[in-house]
A protein has these predicted regions:
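Divalent-metal coordination cores built from histidine and acidic residues
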Residues: 1-102, 145-175
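Active-site glycine- and acidic-residue-rich loops that bind
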Residues: 2-7, 41-51, 105-108, 129-143, ...
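Short hydrophobic/aromatic-enriched beta-strand-loop microsegments
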Residues: 19-20, 25, 122-133
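Divalent metal-coordination and catalytic microenvironments
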Residues: 23, 61, 65, 97, ...
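Charged helix-capping and loop-helix junction motifs
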Residues: 81-91, 139-143, 184-186, 219-221
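His/Asp/Glu-enriched, well-ordered alpha-helical/loop segment
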Residues: 99, 174-176, 184-271
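Catalytic cores of alpha/beta
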Residues: 110-119
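Glycine-enriched alpha-helix->loop->beta-strand junction motifs that scaffold or abut catalytic
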Residues: 118-124, 150-155, 172-176, 198-201
Length: 299
């Protein structure tokens, strides 16, 4: 988000200007001057800055708070292996958000940022890629740290569309690209499997909005999780519905088909619990029990 545009779209949907999904928005991510995603416009370089930034996004109507704990891959000069905030700043972000009744998500690529985010009380880790601090190593997976994440109850979101969608059976990628992606995929497979084995709560996400990752291709991530990561179709569906709903504190409202919950429903042609690609054959979309799309009327 830049300029709180997602909150404006959310308001337009709520006011009935056009149909759309249920949007839960964080507004611009809180980062540092010259930090990852600095061009989104919300910088914080001290404890007071962090406190002010959290209060500011909540004042504007954010549903939750996002802080960019480590550098990232798509910002020139940013170092994804290193923390951008001090442990004290991360604690202030979490405590201030929680005081205001909001949960906090942390963009987290480097292993250096995991312990400070754990100690700060961050609610969800986005990516959690275990990138090594030393550039001589690519990744640094630490089982005891993973067990600590599991014990804390933190949910980790894995973005599995991006590079990996070109490895799906119906895609054709240049051979050189496939070789590079396969190497990355094998490393991801190992970390993903170990995190699941050690009991970390996992949710599937997309990082949609970045180059090459479209909002309408979310299902590709579920297919990658099943085809390449060894998840069952039903586990992948739960990791993109029930688990994230619970991670957002909305498990009593959405995420499962239970009497009394909001009727946010997608119906597909086929049995997605057996064949994950059935999710590509959408026949009905409902929000709050109201039909937004029906294949029978779309034509």
């Amino acid at each position: 988000d830049r300029g709180f545009v997602t909150l404006k779209v959310r308001r337009a949907i709520e006011d009935g200007l056009f149909s759309g999904p249920r949007l839960l928005c964080s507004g611009p991510p809180i980062t540092t001057t010259a930090g990852h995603l600095h061009y989104c416009g919300l910088h914080a370089d001290s404890l007071d800055d962090v406190r002010r930034a959290v209060r500011g996004v909540v004042e504007r109507g954010a549903d939750y708070v996002k802080i960019v704990a480590t550098g990232g891959m798509m910002t020139p000069g940013s170092n994804p292996r290193r923390c951008q905030f001090s442990p004290e700043e991360l604690k202030v972000a979490a405590s201030e958000a929680h005081r205001l009744g909001k949960r906090v998500a942390a963009h987290l690529l480097g292993v250096e940022g995991i312990q400070p985010c754990l100690q700060a009380g961050i609610d969800t880790f986005e990516h959690c890629s275990w990138m090594a601090r030393d550039e001589a190593e690519e990744f640094d997976f630490r089982p005891e740290l993973a067990r600590e994440i599991a014990r804390s109850g933190i949910t980790c979101g894995h973005t599995m569309v991006g590079l990996y969608r070109d490895l799906l059976p119906d895609r054709e990628a240049p051979e050189a690209v496939q070789v590079e992606q396969l190497e990355q995929l094998r490393a991801l497979q190992e970390r993903f499997a170990r995190m699941r084995e050690l009991g970390i709560r996992m949710m599937l996400s997309s990082d949609a909005g970045v180059a090459g990752t479209r909002f309408d291709r979310f299902v590709d991530g579920l297919e990658v999780a099943v085809v390449a990561m060894g998840m069952s179709p039903l586990a992948a569906i739960e990791a993109s519905t029930r688990v994230p709903a619970e991670a957002l504190g909305l498990g009593d409202e959405i995420g499962t088909l239970v009497p009394g919950k909001r009727a946010d429903i997608v119906a597909v042609k086929g049995d997605a619990s057996a064949d994950i690609t059935a999710l590509k054959r959408v026949s009905l979309v409902m929000r709050d029990g109201r039909v937004l799309h029906s294949a029978s009327t779309a034509a």
